[in-house]
Amino acid sequence: MEADWDEVSQVAVPPPGPHLLPTVASTVAFDDSQELLWVGNEFGRVSSFYGPELQRYTSVKAHASSEGQVRQFLFHDKGVISLSANSVHLASRCGLTQWHISHPEMTELRCMSFTAQPHKIIVAGLQSAMFIIDVEKGAIVDQLSTEYRYTIMKRSRYLCAATDTGSVNVLSLTDFSVVKSWKAHGAVINDMDARNDFLVTCGFSVRHAGSPIVDPLANVYDLKSLIPLPPIPFHAGAAFVRMHPRLQTTSFIASQTGQLQVVDLMNPNTINLRQANVAFMLGLEVSPSGEALAINDAECSIHLWGSPSKIHFNEIGKETEFSDIPTRPSMLDWSNDTPLNVIGMPYYHERLLSAWPSHLIFEIGNAPVPMDPAILPYLRPSEIGQYAQNPRKKRRYQVENTRLQSSTEVALAAPKFLSEKARELPNSKPEGAQEAVGALQGLKINGETKEDPLLKYSNVEIKYSKFGVDDFDFRYYNKTEFSGLETHIANSFTNSLLQLLKFIPLVRNLALHHVSTNCLCESCLLCEMGFLFDMLDKANGQNCQATNLLKTFSGFREAANLGLLEESLSNKSLSSAIQSVHRFFLNQIAHDYRTVYPNSDSLDNTLSTAAVESICCMFCRNEIVRPGNAFVTELIYPAADPKQAHRNQACRFSNILRSSIERETQNRGWCSTCRRYQQVSIRKTVQRMPLVLMLNAAINNSAHRRFWSIPGWLPEKIGVMIEDNQIQCYEGEQLRIRQQNNFEGLVVYELVGIVAEIDIVEQKKPHLVSFVDVSISAREPTKKSNWHLFNDFLVTGVSKEEVFSFNQGWKSPCTLAYQISTGRHGLDDSWKNELDTTLLFYEWSMNNRPPTDKCHILKSEEKPIAGTPIALDTEFVDLEKAEIEVKADGTQEMIRPSKSGLARVSVIRGSGNDEGVPFIDDYITIKDPIVDYVTQYSGIKPGDLDPRTSRHNLVALKVAYKKLWLLLNLGCVFVGHGLASDFRKINIQVPKAQTIDTQYLFFHPGKNRRLSLRYLAWAVFKEYIQEETTTTTSTSITTTTNPNIHDANTSTTTTTAITTTPPEGHDSIEDARMALRLWKKFKEYEDAGIVNQILEEIFREGVKVGFRPPARYPSQATPNPNNNNINNGVNPNGLSTPGSTNPISRLPLSGRNTPDFILPASASAAASVTGGPAGGGSSNGSMSGSTPSTPRQAFRRSTALTPSNGSFGGAKGLTFGGSPMR
């Protein structure tokens, strides 16, 4: 060890998982051919580090975590050999597995070494067998028995092996017989090394107190003469030793406290001492070159020692292979005019498959006819295949043409769009209700005389017109007061399960009480359920969407690993998927609940079946008891014939439920006493039943399915008693008798709902529905059941007989929910009085950016109360563009609308001394890819939503959402413009009584047009907002006089310069403040009784200027060929006068952040002349004269909207009676 040796680098041992803490290294070794240091941990992971800087190179899972730590490394030309307690693993240095060997008798491997043959190794341990493994073949070639239990092996002239008793056996390299044996230490040998003719050992001995201590001597042995040599004293305690690879008599000895000693075995008085900066040393390793030393400590670190100027692991090492750095593709100037051929295609030398000639296309045999699912339950095995009775659905010799697509698909026809109904039936009575009732109560198809029950179970699908989802008539599918859930969202197959959970009163109470706390965890599924349940309550039959909840669900890595997400369901049945999601939901909400209430057992009492599980070995009778709590019970069906169910009590639902809860099974498992796998019996003993009993039907075959086909098999009520640690279940007459006799301890459950899979053959695509008894969660007490079908956004009442009938092959139960009967009507709304509003009075930021000076957080004395007005405005960015299908005739159909993400929320005070001052101005961080920031309308720029670069106050979506949710439930009244669109994108439901939308305040019943906020600001206040450009005008005047001519005229030249700056987009604070001012002004008009006159004037001026503010400056106005006014409607002061037009302005006309199309100047001017009062047209005629500049404007002119939160008021929809203020 030279004088400049010191610690060169230090690296932490990689943790076993991405969210786990680092662990100590169990073994360390230098590669003998490359500049790599290999490290093994306690969980079977092997990692490598490159060079003196210890850069991470590879990391692989070589052994199972159950096998414990990695014990030792050996190096071969093919790769790295690692050893664990039960296996030997060879992987290339790049991490690819070459072979993995395990054996039943490999129970406690500890060490290995190369033999006399370089391609064979011997492995041994605390076991009676040693194995010879051929590295080239990757197989065990020999097995040797031994009476010694070895812990360490080192190869030199002989094979030196340390035993667990402190002895060292010198083994022959040919037959592995014991040549010599020494008792090196009193207890165990902790470390040893052998090189050339010397063997050095370090170990422990037992002293008088009975505990082992480190020996202060390192024993030395001569392998040539097989005699011991004088030991080397080491007063700090010799714990680790390594021989120098190039100096034959030099060794490194170290203590557990980090003291290093370099000593010459032939001259022990010549020593070199160093102290390593470690708390507790666990290992020592020397590189093959002798220039580097690796120290492993108890603080999960690896320390590399050496000379900084010339440290190398190997004298002549091979070059380490690294992954290729991919060449970045060249940047293309991509635009709408860029031809596709600039992208290019790969070089090819053969003809492409796409060039297949048409004359080589032939028709082959027809596809086989699909099996009729009606005969599947009746199949019987035979010698070859299976057989069943012919159902005789076809005539003799009649076959099915499988090439033709089935045109008899049973489906509920989509209703007409609201715009079509308003356009086609302007004066007729609304018939949409009659159409919906007829469809949902059973339409007659193909002349059938009976009602077709499949219609309401059909797949429902949202259709989109050019006006988006607002034009779809959801009320056609739902005439009830219970809201459905939309389907155009990823993982919406869980809608049926969410509806079932919502109508369980005790689960609903848990979710709402949890969300009213200060929980701000972004991935809290229980909070999202609370938000959804509250939204469904407030919707009162209007369609809702579970966007935020399903987005949170999609973000769980565990859900993706379990294959629970929609993209993983291609080869998985919906029935098994929803049952897995059911288990995941309940386990996750239990975890979320405990994060807020770690010491509360309310959720466990509600959902968890408390039980203990006893595991008994059938051989030695050793028994282990562990907790066996479960949130979901999987039904286990008996092997009895369902046909004998009426005579066999074991086939009753109550007995199947009892055996499923108190299940007793036999399986093979590990017995710690026998130390091997044995047959074990597992029995569960129930200690407490939950208030809500959640079941999975677990139908795996046709025999299970036949139990459900028995009429009346599923009971509406069940009774459960626990007597002497045994559970008893009752149903029917048995339950009724025990209820009448008031049996002590009897708990009665009633069925809340069922999730079922609907698989109608003609539809070719299964889906899920839920049946719910809504009377259980009704606020008004009632004993009569009221069953409803929830088929996504189709909601209708159904009879109890239809719910409990499962003898149809297309309906299969998946999940059931029973609730204790005393919890009926148990809706607890006390959470509304216990809202934790701390978030409203606290500055929350992800990037430590305080709110701007414009924003002032609410003070405690400003706590909102019911009726407090607040003004709201939001901005959004595009996460996905709309999917448009272009048909063969050129028509376009929207398949899926664009997907927006909330980017900014601004809320300002609507009353008080600080009226108009914002108290919320949050930018929301978005993890999803953003396809368009729509800066010209949103004001959001790239980088504004990135915590690393944003200059704004960034919060998580849940924080921004919860602030609005708190304000909603405090009773605040939201003032804004176009709030319906904002609320839909935010995914929040606000009652009409808490909404004031200036879009509907300034609505003329006979004009059929909604005015933009920008135009209203100009029409009411003559102010300009939402301007795309900032214009600066400068004027210079030059006067010239000829002095040679008396009384000469003076000429004056005026130069005007106009400078424009790029668009900055909308400011949500400015828009919210303007909406608040418009509401205040409207109240003044109401008090004065001049609302109608003002609206007439606003619309009259709007016709003149095209419902857009006129140009602010003269040079911005476009000459109108039909207008002879030399100033073109612009006064000398630069402010527009009524009647001026700007037909080619690109500013929005109406709607929220809606871009307009550019109209030709002639067309717009002609429209203004034709439609204006000068043209002699009526008000309707003037409206038709103004050409719509967007599809949404065209729709607004064809039909009127009511103030019902932005939805259409029926098929007629042509009148609007009054403002929402009245």
Swiss-Prot record:
From start to end residue, where is composition biased (Low complexity)? Answer: 1050-1061, 1119-1133, 1180-1191
Q: What is its EC number?
A: 3.1.13.4
Q: Which GO terms describe its cellular component?
A: P-body; PAN complex
Q: How is its activity regulated?
A: Positively regulated by the regulatory subunit PAN3.
What processes does the entry annotate via GO biological process terms? mRNA processing; nuclear-transcribed mRNA poly(A) tail shortening
The annotated regions of Gly residues compositional bias extend over: 1207-1216
SUPFAM superfamilies attached here? Cysteine proteinases, Ribonuclease H-like, WD40 repeat-like
> By what name is this protein known?
PAN2-PAN3 deadenylation complex catalytic subunit PAN2
Name the species this protein comes from: Coccidioides immitis (strain RS) (Valley fever fungus)
Provide the taxonomic classification.
Eukaryota, Fungi, Dikarya, Ascomycota, Pezizomycotina
